[in-house]
Amino acid sequence: MSTQSERPNKLLGHAGRWLQSLVDRGRRSDGLLQSAQTWEAQYAAGKWDFLAELSELSRFSILAGYICHLKPGGAVLDTGCGQGALQRRLPSDSYSRYVGIDLSASAISVARKQQNERSTFLAADCENYSPEERFDVIVFNEVLCCLRDPLRTVERYVRSLNSGGLVLVSLCSAARGSATILWRLRQAYATVDEVRLAHSGRKVAWVCTALRPQGE
């Protein structure tokens, strides 16, 4: 069961701490993503299989809903797409183009099994990847807390947005630095919509935000 109310002090429970521990294992002390081998090992051990569970449905539904209702038929870039959980939740006619990137080659290999004529999955580090095309929606789904300089990364990707394009962000409230990242994003970009979700069973909460460049 999920609600749109959030009580951070009660929701930083076991699930949130466990998720943070996974993220921390993918970091170096300077905050930069660790080698791809770390993420490969986690995917091989099934550490991220929970992203396909019912408890994640509400969060993914918000992101998919933003895409379907705010930019129907648009081109979508999904950074840190993992095994393609977001694309699986998108109707095939809801986008004209979908590109998913992830540091883990094994995750991308799984995602490619659902690839269609309008979608592409690439093994790439989102901190270094340079899009070769422009998009109507760029998604940062539980990614920004893993990056050394999340705001600069978002700024770089925004240059690949079409006019009127959107940035979609999902952050687990238990993830270290998430509140600061969200505050800085709200200062730099216009908030189109924001939803706070809490899952009572897993004791975890998220914030899903739709943003656009100022002045558009």
Language model regions located:
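Conserved class I S-adenosyl-L-methionine
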Residues: 5-67, 73-82, 175-176
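Core SAM-dependent methyltransferase catalytic element
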Residues: 198-216
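A short acidic, Gly/Pro-enriched loop at the edge of an enzyme's catalytic core
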Residues: 130-138
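Class I SAM-dependent methyltransferase SAM/SAH-binding core
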Residues: 83-127
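Conserved beta-strand signature within the Rossmann-like core of class I S-adenosyl-L-methionine
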Residues: 164-172
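A short SAM/SAH-binding and catalytic strip from SAM-dependent methyltransferases
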Residues: 137-148
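A short glycine-rich, Lys/Arg-flanked "PGG" loop and its adjoining helix->strand segment in the class I
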Residues: 152-163
